[in-house]
Amino acid sequence: MGVPFDYAPERPEHIDAILNGLDRYNPETTNIFQEYVTLQCEEKTYDCYANLALLKLYQFNPHLTKDETITNILVKSLTVFPSPDFSLALHLLPPHILTPISSSSALPAAGDAPLSEAVQKLAVLNTLLSSANYSQFWSTLDSDDLYADLIADVSGFEELIRIRIASTISQSVREIPSSELENWLGMNGEAFEKFIKEVCGWTIENGSVIVPLNKENEAKGTVVRENVKMEQFSRVIRRAYEQPA
Protein backbone atom coordinates (compact mmCIF):
# COMPACT_ATOMS: atom_id res chain seq x y z
CA MET A 1 0.00 0.00 0.00
CA GLY A 2 1.33 3.44 -0.93
CA VAL A 3 1.76 6.40 1.38
CA PRO A 4 -1.50 8.39 1.82
CA PHE A 5 -1.57 11.74 0.07
CA ASP A 6 -2.22 13.63 3.30
CA TYR A 7 0.58 11.94 5.26
CA ALA A 8 3.47 14.02 6.59
CA PRO A 9 5.65 12.41 9.29
CA GLU A 10 6.96 15.73 10.63
CA ARG A 11 3.52 17.37 10.93
CA PRO A 12 2.94 18.90 14.41
CA GLU A 13 -0.07 17.63 16.37
CA HIS A 14 -1.86 21.00 16.39
CA ILE A 15 -1.63 21.22 12.59
CA ASP A 16 -2.94 17.67 12.26
CA ALA A 17 -5.87 18.53 14.53
CA ILE A 18 -6.77 21.54 12.38
CA LEU A 19 -6.57 19.58 9.13
CA ASN A 20 -8.83 16.84 10.49
CA GLY A 21 -11.45 19.20 11.88
CA LEU A 22 -13.68 22.06 10.84
CA ASP A 23 -11.02 24.61 11.78
CA ARG A 24 -9.26 23.98 8.46
CA TYR A 25 -11.94 26.28 6.97
CA ASN A 26 -11.60 28.88 9.72
CA PRO A 27 -9.84 32.07 8.49
CA GLU A 28 -8.34 32.48 11.95
CA THR A 29 -6.07 29.50 11.28
CA THR A 30 -4.42 31.30 8.35
CA ASN A 31 -1.61 32.68 10.49
CA ILE A 32 -0.96 29.23 11.96
CA PHE A 33 -0.63 27.70 8.49
CA GLN A 34 1.60 30.57 7.34
CA GLU A 35 3.94 30.02 10.27
CA TYR A 36 3.97 26.32 9.43
CA VAL A 37 5.07 27.09 5.87
CA THR A 38 7.91 29.17 7.28
CA LEU A 39 8.87 26.25 9.54
CA GLN A 40 8.94 23.88 6.56
CA CYS A 41 11.24 26.25 4.69
CA GLU A 42 13.62 26.48 7.63
CA GLU A 43 13.73 22.82 8.64
CA LYS A 44 13.65 21.17 5.17
CA THR A 45 10.35 19.43 5.90
CA TYR A 46 7.36 19.35 3.59
CA ASP A 47 3.59 19.04 4.04
CA CYS A 48 1.66 19.29 0.79
CA TYR A 49 -1.74 18.70 2.40
CA ALA A 50 -1.34 21.58 4.86
CA ASN A 51 0.01 23.90 2.16
CA LEU A 52 -2.94 23.20 -0.12
CA ALA A 53 -5.31 23.84 2.79
CA LEU A 54 -3.73 27.28 3.22
CA LEU A 55 -4.08 28.09 -0.48
CA LYS A 56 -7.74 27.06 -0.22
CA LEU A 57 -8.19 29.51 2.65
CA TYR A 58 -6.65 32.20 0.44
CA GLN A 59 -9.28 31.41 -2.21
CA PHE A 60 -12.10 32.10 0.22
CA ASN A 61 -10.33 34.98 1.98
CA PRO A 62 -8.27 36.92 -0.61
CA HIS A 63 -7.61 39.74 1.85
CA LEU A 64 -5.51 37.35 3.96
CA THR A 65 -3.24 36.36 1.08
CA LYS A 66 0.53 36.74 1.50
CA ASP A 67 2.50 36.69 -1.74
CA GLU A 68 5.69 35.49 -0.06
CA THR A 69 3.91 32.50 1.45
CA ILE A 70 2.45 31.55 -1.94
CA THR A 71 5.85 31.62 -3.63
CA ASN A 72 7.42 29.70 -0.76
CA ILE A 73 4.78 26.96 -1.15
CA LEU A 74 5.49 26.76 -4.87
CA VAL A 75 9.26 26.65 -4.33
CA LYS A 76 8.88 23.90 -1.73
CA SER A 77 6.72 21.89 -4.14
CA LEU A 78 9.54 22.03 -6.70
CA THR A 79 11.76 20.14 -4.27
CA VAL A 80 9.53 17.05 -4.47
CA PHE A 81 9.32 16.72 -8.25
CA PRO A 82 8.29 14.66 -10.21
CA SER A 83 5.22 14.63 -7.94
CA PRO A 84 2.26 16.76 -9.16
CA ASP A 85 2.33 19.01 -6.09
CA PHE A 86 3.38 22.13 -8.00
CA SER A 87 0.45 21.78 -10.41
CA LEU A 88 -1.95 21.14 -7.54
CA ALA A 89 -0.85 24.35 -5.83
CA LEU A 90 -0.88 26.28 -9.10
CA HIS A 91 -4.53 25.43 -9.76
CA LEU A 92 -5.57 26.93 -6.43
CA LEU A 93 -4.27 30.37 -7.42
CA PRO A 94 -6.45 33.07 -9.02
CA PRO A 95 -6.59 32.71 -12.84
CA HIS A 96 -5.30 36.23 -13.50
CA ILE A 97 -2.06 35.39 -11.69
CA LEU A 98 -1.43 32.53 -14.10
CA THR A 99 -2.01 34.64 -17.22
CA PRO A 100 1.10 36.27 -18.74
CA ILE A 101 0.88 40.00 -18.13
CA SER A 102 1.64 40.82 -21.77
CA SER A 103 -1.33 38.76 -23.00
CA SER A 104 -3.77 39.64 -20.25
CA SER A 105 -6.86 41.49 -21.46
CA ALA A 106 -6.98 43.56 -18.29
CA LEU A 107 -4.36 45.10 -16.08
CA PRO A 108 -3.64 43.12 -12.91
CA ALA A 109 -4.90 44.42 -9.61
CA ALA A 110 -2.55 46.44 -7.46
CA GLY A 111 0.17 44.19 -6.07
CA ASP A 112 -0.59 41.27 -8.39
CA ALA A 113 2.04 41.97 -11.06
CA PRO A 114 5.08 40.97 -8.93
CA LEU A 115 3.34 37.77 -7.78
CA SER A 116 2.24 36.94 -11.31
CA GLU A 117 5.80 37.31 -12.60
CA ALA A 118 7.19 35.18 -9.78
CA VAL A 119 4.63 32.41 -10.30
CA GLN A 120 5.26 32.30 -14.04
CA LYS A 121 9.03 32.11 -13.51
CA LEU A 122 8.60 29.25 -11.07
CA ALA A 123 6.32 27.54 -13.59
CA VAL A 124 9.22 27.66 -16.06
CA LEU A 125 11.44 25.85 -13.56
CA ASN A 126 8.75 23.25 -12.98
CA THR A 127 8.43 22.63 -16.72
CA LEU A 128 12.19 22.15 -17.06
CA LEU A 129 12.29 19.68 -14.18
CA SER A 130 9.24 17.79 -15.41
CA SER A 131 10.79 17.43 -18.86
CA ALA A 132 14.13 16.28 -17.37
CA ASN A 133 15.89 19.30 -18.89
CA TYR A 134 18.17 19.57 -15.89
CA SER A 135 21.07 21.47 -17.46
CA GLN A 136 18.68 24.17 -18.68
CA PHE A 137 17.10 24.27 -15.22
CA TRP A 138 20.37 25.29 -13.58
CA SER A 139 21.24 27.85 -16.25
CA THR A 140 17.74 29.35 -15.96
CA LEU A 141 17.99 29.45 -12.18
CA ASP A 142 21.24 31.44 -12.47
CA SER A 143 19.96 33.74 -15.20
CA ASP A 144 17.82 36.07 -13.10
CA ASP A 145 18.28 37.60 -9.66
CA LEU A 146 14.55 37.14 -9.06
CA TYR A 147 15.11 33.39 -8.85
CA ALA A 148 17.68 33.91 -6.10
CA ASP A 149 15.16 36.00 -4.17
CA LEU A 150 12.41 33.41 -4.63
CA ILE A 151 14.43 30.48 -3.29
CA ALA A 152 16.20 32.44 -0.54
CA ASP A 153 13.69 31.47 2.17
CA VAL A 154 13.84 27.75 1.38
CA SER A 155 16.78 26.21 3.21
CA GLY A 156 18.83 23.76 1.15
CA PHE A 157 16.78 24.28 -2.03
CA GLU A 158 19.57 23.40 -4.46
CA GLU A 159 20.64 20.33 -2.48
CA LEU A 160 17.05 19.06 -2.32
CA ILE A 161 16.69 19.50 -6.08
CA ARG A 162 19.95 17.64 -6.71
CA ILE A 163 18.79 14.76 -4.53
CA ARG A 164 15.55 14.50 -6.50
CA ILE A 165 17.42 14.63 -9.80
CA ALA A 166 19.78 11.89 -8.62
CA SER A 167 16.84 9.79 -7.46
CA THR A 168 15.17 10.12 -10.85
CA ILE A 169 18.39 9.26 -12.68
CA SER A 170 18.94 6.16 -10.54
CA GLN A 171 15.65 4.75 -11.81
CA SER A 172 16.74 4.71 -15.44
CA VAL A 173 20.52 4.33 -15.78
CA ARG A 174 23.36 2.15 -14.53
CA GLU A 175 26.25 4.25 -15.83
CA ILE A 176 26.54 7.85 -16.99
CA PRO A 177 29.51 10.06 -18.03
CA SER A 178 30.66 12.28 -15.17
CA SER A 179 30.71 15.37 -17.39
CA GLU A 180 27.07 14.88 -18.34
CA LEU A 181 25.98 14.28 -14.78
CA GLU A 182 27.86 17.40 -13.67
CA ASN A 183 25.70 19.43 -16.03
CA TRP A 184 22.54 17.75 -14.81
CA LEU A 185 23.40 18.40 -11.16
CA GLY A 186 24.76 21.90 -11.74
CA MET A 187 28.04 21.24 -9.93
CA ASN A 188 31.57 20.01 -10.60
CA GLY A 189 34.96 19.31 -9.06
CA GLU A 190 35.30 18.22 -5.46
CA ALA A 191 31.74 19.27 -4.62
CA PHE A 192 30.44 16.96 -7.35
CA GLU A 193 32.55 14.00 -6.21
CA LYS A 194 31.53 14.51 -2.59
CA PHE A 195 27.85 14.61 -3.51
CA ILE A 196 28.12 11.49 -5.66
CA LYS A 197 29.97 9.45 -3.05
CA GLU A 198 28.56 10.70 0.26
CA VAL A 199 25.00 11.67 -0.60
CA CYS A 200 24.17 9.28 -3.44
CA GLY A 201 26.44 6.40 -2.44
CA TRP A 202 27.59 5.96 -6.04
CA THR A 203 31.12 5.45 -7.38
CA ILE A 204 33.19 7.13 -10.07
CA GLU A 205 35.26 4.93 -12.39
CA ASN A 206 37.17 5.94 -15.54
CA GLY A 207 35.26 9.17 -16.03
CA SER A 208 31.85 7.61 -15.49
CA VAL A 209 29.48 7.46 -12.55
CA ILE A 210 28.34 3.95 -11.65
CA VAL A 211 24.83 3.66 -10.24
CA PRO A 212 24.19 0.53 -8.13
CA LEU A 213 21.66 -1.98 -9.35
CA ASN A 214 18.12 -1.47 -8.11
CA LYS A 215 14.69 -2.78 -9.05
CA GLU A 216 14.03 0.27 -11.25
CA ASN A 217 17.19 0.33 -13.39
CA GLU A 218 17.61 -3.44 -13.73
CA ALA A 219 17.00 -4.69 -17.25
CA LYS A 220 14.71 -7.64 -16.77
CA GLY A 221 12.36 -9.29 -19.21
CA THR A 222 8.76 -9.65 -18.16
CA VAL A 223 6.62 -12.61 -19.15
CA VAL A 224 2.88 -12.17 -18.83
CA ARG A 225 0.75 -15.30 -18.96
CA GLU A 226 -3.01 -15.34 -19.05
CA ASN A 227 -5.21 -18.41 -18.81
CA VAL A 228 -8.37 -18.44 -20.94
CA LYS A 229 -10.95 -21.10 -20.19
CA MET A 230 -12.48 -23.05 -23.09
CA GLU A 231 -15.98 -21.85 -22.26
CA GLN A 232 -14.83 -18.24 -22.58
CA PHE A 233 -13.22 -18.98 -25.95
CA SER A 234 -16.29 -20.80 -27.27
CA ARG A 235 -18.47 -17.87 -26.26
CA VAL A 236 -16.39 -15.55 -28.45
CA ILE A 237 -16.70 -17.90 -31.44
CA ARG A 238 -20.45 -18.28 -30.92
CA ARG A 239 -20.96 -14.54 -30.93
CA ALA A 240 -19.08 -14.26 -34.21
CA TYR A 241 -21.77 -16.41 -35.88
CA GLU A 242 -24.73 -14.72 -34.25
CA GLN A 243 -26.97 -12.76 -36.59
CA PRO A 244 -27.31 -9.06 -35.79
CA ALA A 245 -30.71 -8.07 -34.44
Swiss-Prot record:
Name the coiled-coil region(s): none
Q: Which InterPro entries match?
A: ARM-type_fold, CSN8_PSD8_EIF3K, eIF3k, PCI_dom, Transl_init_fac_sub12_N_euk, WH-like_DNA-bd_sf, WH_DNA-bd_sf
Keywords tagged on the record: Cytoplasm, Initiation factor, Protein biosynthesis
Q: Which GO terms describe its cellular component?
A: eukaryotic 43S preinitiation complex; eukaryotic 48S preinitiation complex; eukaryotic translation initiation factor 3 complex
Q: Where does it localize?
A: Cytoplasm
The chain positions of domain PCI read: 46-227
Tell me, in one coarse class, where this protein mainly resides: cytoplasm
Instruction: Look up the signal peptide feature and give its range.
Output: none
List the GO molecular function terms: ribosome binding; RNA binding; translation initiation factor activity
One Pfam family name from the record?
CSN8_PSD8_EIF3K
GO biological process terms on file: formation of cytoplasmic translation initiation complex; regulation of translational initiation
| Subunit annotation | Component of the eukaryotic translation initiation factor 3 (eIF-3) complex.
Name the protein family. Answer: Belongs to the eIF-3 subunit K family.
Q: What does this protein do?
A: Component of the eukaryotic translation initiation factor 3 (eIF-3) complex, which is involved in protein synthesis of a specialized repertoire of mRNAs and, together with other initiation factors, stimulates binding of mRNA and methionyl-tRNAi to the 40S ribosome. The eIF-3 complex specifically targets and initiates translation of a subset of mRNAs involved in cell proliferation.
Q: Which HAMAP family match?
A: eIF3k
Q: Could you tell me what this protein is called?
A: Eukaryotic translation initiation factor 3 subunit K
Q: Which organism is it from?
A: Sclerotinia sclerotiorum (strain ATCC 18683 / 1980 / Ss-1)
Q: What is the lineage of its organism?
A: Eukaryota, Fungi, Dikarya, Ascomycota, Pezizomycotina
